[in-house]
C-alpha cells in the first residue's frame, strides 16, 4: 500500500530540487496531503490564488444583489463542555495553550466558487464540491531557497470597540498567548534553520468582514536555512507541521487534548496550503474555511485558550470568526 506521506514528500523534494512549480495542501493530521505540478492542474476542479500566484484568469462573476449569510453557532452549553475539558488540562499542566475549534452550520446564496472568487483574502483555495478557504494567515515563506520566515497570527478583536488596538495589545491573556506561540514557532523554525530571530513582534493587521472590521495581531519570526538546503520542501514542511498557531504548546499533548475536546474531524481546516514558483516557496494556514458536507455548509473556526480564558469571551471569538470577507454580505 502506498504511503501518502512518503509520496508527498518525494514529490515536493523532487520538484523543489528540479525547480518545478507546484501547489500543495496538507490536512491538519497530515493524513491526506495533496500536491500538483502547476502545469497539470485542472482549473475546473482546483482553483487557487496564493498571494497573487494563481491559476484563475478572466473577470469575476456577478454576485446576487442581496447576499445571504446566516450562521447557526453551537449552543454555548455545548461549547462550555469542550472549554471546561481544555481548562482542566491547562490547570493540570498538560498544556500552556490550546487552540479549540468548533463547526458552525451556515446558509448562504453564494456557491463555494463565488466565495473563492470574491473574498478579500491573500490566500484562497477552492476544491470543487469539497471546500473553500480564504485565509489571512501566512505559515512560512522561503525566499531564494535561503531565507525562511513565519508569521503566527494570534489575537483578534472587534475594531469598533473603543481603543481596540490598545485594548488587545495590553490584555495580559492575549499577551501571554501570543508570547507562547512566538516561542513555539521560533523553536519550530530552529528545527530547519541555522539562525532564528524575531523580526517583528505583535503588529496589527485590519481585516474587513461582511459585517465588521477585525484587528488581528501577528508576529514575524525569521531564519536562515543551512547552506546545504537544495529545495527539499517536502522534508522541510513536514518537520514544521502541524502549525503551532492552530494547535498550541507543547504540540503532542495539546493535539491529544484537542482531539478529546473537539470530537469532530478538522480535515483540511487548520492544515497548510502553499506553492513553489520555481524560486520562492510560500504557504498559509488554512483558517477561515467552509466545507461542503453532503450539501450542508460547515464553517470551522477556533481560538486560543489559556488558563485565564473566559468561556463566554472565547465562544464569542469563534462566532466572530465565522464571516465572509466580502463587502455587503449580511
Predicted regions and their residues:
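Extended alpha-helical targeting/anchoring segments
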Residues: 1-330
Amino acid at each position: 500500500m502506498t504511503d501518502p506521506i512518503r509520496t508527498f514528500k518525494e514529490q515536493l523534494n523532487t520538484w523543489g530540487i528540479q525547480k518545478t512549480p507546484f501547489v500543495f495542501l496538507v490536512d491538519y493530521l497530515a493524513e491526506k496531503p495533496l500536491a500538483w505540478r502547476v502545469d497539470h492542474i485542472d482549473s475546473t476542479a482546483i482553483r487557487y490564488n496564493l498571494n497573487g500566484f494563481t491559476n484563475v484568469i478572466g473577470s469575476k462573476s456577478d454576485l446576487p444583489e442581496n447576499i445571504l449569510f446566516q450562521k447557526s453557532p453551537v449552543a454555548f452549553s455545548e461549547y462550555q463542555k469542550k472549554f471546561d475539558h481544555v481548562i482542566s488540562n491547562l490547570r493540570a499542566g498538560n498544556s500552556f495553550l490550546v487552540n479549540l475549534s468548533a463547526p458552525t452550520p451556515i446558509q448562504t446564496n453564494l456557491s463555494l466558487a463565488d466565495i473563492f472568487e470574491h473574498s478579500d483574502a491573500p490566500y484562497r483555495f477552492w476544491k470543487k464540491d469539497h471546500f473553500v478557504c480564504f485565509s489571512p494567515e501566512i505559515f512560512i515563506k522561503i525566499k531564494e531557497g535561503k531565507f525562511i520566515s513565519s508569521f503566527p497570527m494570534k489575537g483578534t478583536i472587534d475594531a469598533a470597540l473603543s481603543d481596540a488596538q490598545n485594548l488587545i495589545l495590553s490584555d495580559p491573556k492575549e499577551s501571554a498567548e501570543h508570547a507562547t506561540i512566538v516561542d513555539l514557532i521560533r523553536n519550530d523554525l530552529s528545527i530547519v534553520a541555522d539562525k532564528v530571530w524575531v523580526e517583528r513582534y505583535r503588529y496589527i493587521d485590519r481585516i474587513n468582514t461582511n459585517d465588521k472590521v477585525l484587528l488581528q495581531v501577528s508576529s514575524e519570526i525569521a531564519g536562515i536555512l543551512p547552506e546545504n538546503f537544495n529545495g527539499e520542501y517536502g522534508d522541510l514542511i513536514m518537520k514544521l507541521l502541524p502549525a503551532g498557531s492552530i494547535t498550541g504548546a507543547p504540540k503532542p499533548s495539546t493535539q491529544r487534548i484537542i482531539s478529546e475536546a473537539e470530537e469532530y474531524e478538522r480535515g483540511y481546516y487548520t492544515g497548510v496550503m502553499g506553492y513553489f514558483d520555481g524560486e520562492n516557496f510560500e504557504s498559509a494556514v488554512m483558517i477561515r474555511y467552509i466545507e461542503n458536507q453532503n450539501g450542508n455548509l460547515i464553517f470551522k473556526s477556533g481560538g486560543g485558550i489559556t488558563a485565564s480564558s473566559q468561556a463566554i469571551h472565547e465562544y464569542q471569538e469563534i462566532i466572530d470568526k465565522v464571516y465572509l470577507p466580502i463587502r455587503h454580505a449580511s
